[in-house]
Amino acid sequence: MQAKKRYLILFSAGVCLILLFYLQGPASRRTPKRGDDPHPHWPHFSDPLRAFIPWDQTETEDYNVRASPRHKRDDSTGADKCRMDSCFDFELCKRNGFKVYVYPQQKGEKISESYQNILSSIEGSRFYTSDPGQACLFVLNLDTLDRDQLSPQYVHNLKTKIQNLNLWNNGRNHLIFNLYSGTWPDYTEDLGFDIGQAMLAKASISTESFRPNFDISIPLFSKDHPRTGGERGFLKYNTIPPFRKYMLVFKGKRYLTGIGSDTRNALYHIHNAEDVVLLTTCKHGKDWQKHKDARCDKDNAEYDRYDYKEMLHNSTFCLVPRGRRLGSFRFLEALQAACVPVMLSNGWELPFSEIIDWRTAAVIGDERLLLQIPSTVRSIHQDRILSLRQQTQFLWEAYFSSVEKIVLTTLEIIQDRVLQHSAHSTLMWNRLPGGLFTLPQYSSYLGDFPFFYALLGIKPHQKFTAVIHAVTPLVSQSQPIFKLLVAVAKSQFCAQIMVLWNCDKPLPSKHRWPATSVPVIVIEGESKVMSSRFLPYENIITDAVLSLDEDTVLSTTEVDFAFTVWQSFPERIVGYPARSHFWDSNKERWGYTSKWTNDYSMVLTGAAFYHRYYNYLYTHYLPGSLKGLVDQLSNCEDILMNFLVSAVTKMPPIKVTQKKQYKETMMGQTSRASRWADPDHFAQRQTCMNKFASWFGTMPLVHSQMRLDPVLFRDQVSILRKKYRDIERL
């Protein structure tokens, strides 16, 4: 019996061995030997840090190792792999520079107000061209902003309409704007038509679908967002320490089900109703009562007790969680309110991430670490909070306060990609006054701009160039222009004098001009218009420009003192004749006044210093319509320059000394200079004020009550102790 058991055990073991042989043998035989592989792979050594690679990058790592260069090149031609070098024709931009063409609007085609604002911003910019043959970039006349099929703004048959455009060319060199994509319940990023090789300027775009250095992430903005100008940030003054009533706030919808519900449903875990106030409501949508949970009634009641604006303006940090889509209106609201955004939207490509360093203006959180958010924001030092808060105001006013700024920033980014040799530096984008006012075509060296002297630790040039605008023929040696030439030339800081001859009479011979110790360059322009005084002449080799009218009366001491003051404020206009603006509530328009009051908002360029960069900005940034108005009226060029400089700096000009009269009163009445006594001249300046304010979208001029006088000015001390003693006698 025992023998039978032993034989049975041996038989069973043999059967098992045979089964194992047949199961493993074919598998081992199917595995080719190392020398038999017809397509051997490159050896792939395991990465000891592979466990720390984010899950969404592992496929990319394998692709880079396994795929051949030809395979990668073939894949890059797909729409989802587009880059500037593969899906953009640079040849179109070499002929006429960076110009943008907007397709003409078709009859019967509805366009939303937001998309019309986008198109109007492009058409009013310096990039616009009405000739498609000159264009480098094309923008559709079809509204692509809202691609939610449930939206009343949804445009049907868009695919067919786009394919019928004769310049479409599979989207090459085209830019498509989009705010909303996808619909309930998935809210995918599908636009409902094939974008081909077009670039996307899209809100709520994910890092997964974002094509780096090709697409542009823009902020989600409402239909009420202003087209131009926009409100300034709400930060009026800095408080030390920078803490406010609340540490962290949020007020918004709570999605009970579906995408975006996880984070908002969990906010109650960190809400303490004291310094962390995170409020949600279930009252939205048609079927919210069907899905309401046990917390809804309590959440709804608490939600109604708090005022959102009061919370927004009195909180140090503002939570910006994702909604149904990755982007949220709360983002721009927090920026404007100087409430540091705490981003809680994993996978969102932040707006203009290509140029903006968001670490300087926001706290980037992680939805998976929601419970750590309160301790994280509490640990941020107050110096850091103050810096973050100030940067929110800069970014809001520079890039986000209007539709126009969002659109122009988008176009500037694309221009930087096209004209890489003259692209903005990261510093230009992230420091005052921002990339829209710092044109790299002027210079690639930051030291040539008046905004970066302190940052670079340098000073402006120690000399200035005087530019005298002459419109009256030389008749007598007693004319004010001769006295002015002599007085300015005696300044120890004067490098040269330029005379812009805008007179109808022929240019005087050289012997008619007085002898001076500095070079006098006389330039006769081809088009003798008012804007020519602000052209960026190559002859101007100094940073400072002293702009003068031909009938200005200044002494050498006054010139020296004004230049000394300008050296401390090189980004502002510094000079003598002050004017002001006011709001006329009866006429509901802006007014211009030359009355001597206790404040001012303009310093006229008839006797003022400014940086030569503003000549370049005046010529290349301002639209032809404004400069055309100035040339047509032969008036208002000084007001326009003040508008421009104040829009850039957000600060007023600086008046020096108490001098009020700066014009020669004995000019002949037949002279063009006598236009100042013409009543129509003053009325024209009122019109200019409102035309300029309309284009800027706001009133950029800032009032000031500051006047700078020399040390010991009018003090009862010995005249020998005063450096600018002659000023007191004038």
Swiss-Prot record:
EC number from the UniProt entry: 2.4.1.224, 2.4.1.225
InterPro entries documented for this protein: Exostosin, Exostosin_GT47, GT64_dom, Nucleotide-diphossugar_trans
Disulphide connectivity of cysteines: C636-C688
Membrane topology: Single-pass type II membrane protein
Gene3D superfamilies tied to this protein: Spore Coat Polysaccharide Biosynthesis Protein SpsA, Chain A
UniProt cofactor(s): Mn(2+)
GO cellular component: endoplasmic reticulum membrane; Golgi apparatus
Taxonomy, superkingdom: Eukaryota
Main subcellular location of this protein, as a coarse class: endoplasmic reticulum
Key words of the record: Disulfide bond, Endoplasmic reticulum, Glycoprotein, Glycosyltransferase, Manganese, Membrane, Metal-binding, Signal-anchor, Transferase, Transmembrane, Transmembrane helix
Record GO terms (molecular function): acetylglucosaminyltransferase activity; glucuronosyl-N-acetylglucosaminyl-proteoglycan 4-alpha-N-acetylglucosaminyltransferase activity; glucuronosyltransferase activity; metal ion binding; N-acetylglucosaminyl-proteoglycan 4-beta-glucuronosyltransferase activity
Pathway: Protein modification; protein glycosylation
Cytoplasmic side stretches: 1-6
Family as reported in the entry's similarity comment: Belongs to the glycosyltransferase 47 family.
Function as written in the Swiss-Prot or TrEMBL entry: Glycosyltransferase required for the biosynthesis of heparan-sulfate.
Protein name: Exostosin-1a
Organism: Danio rerio
Originating gene: ext1a
